């Protein structure tokens, strides 16, 4: 339902899937247990733009279903669209927290180098 592309290939082994399709499979497996919290660490790293967008759309659907999602990612623009709250960590410590609209260019440059 969330990943129609995988539905077409449901009888194939996971080894035959592309990297992006394998990532979708991993997320789908994690969702089978109806988690209260989903942790995604660089879930779209190294994936094609098409697959990356598909995964971000699924994250938006999950967010609307009230599933808490902790996303660790470098895609600042996409995170600003999806996130309810931001935490910036350096060496294991929170150096900034707030809402996406509060994240200024200066803060991003200082802590994220962007």
Where are these regions (language model features)?
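Helical segment within the ABC ATPase nucleotide-binding domain
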Residues: 53-65
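ABC ATPase C-loop
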Residues: 30-31
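H-loop/switch region of ABC-family ATPase nucleotide-binding domains
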Residues: 73-74
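Catalytic Walker B motif of ABC-type/P-loop ATPase nucleotide-binding domains
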Residues: 38-41
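Conserved catalytic motifs of ABC-family nucleotide-binding domains
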Residues: 34
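Conserved ABC nucleotide-binding domain
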Residues: 2-15
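A short, surface-exposed alpha-helical micro-motif characterized by mixed small hydrophobic
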Residues: 79-81
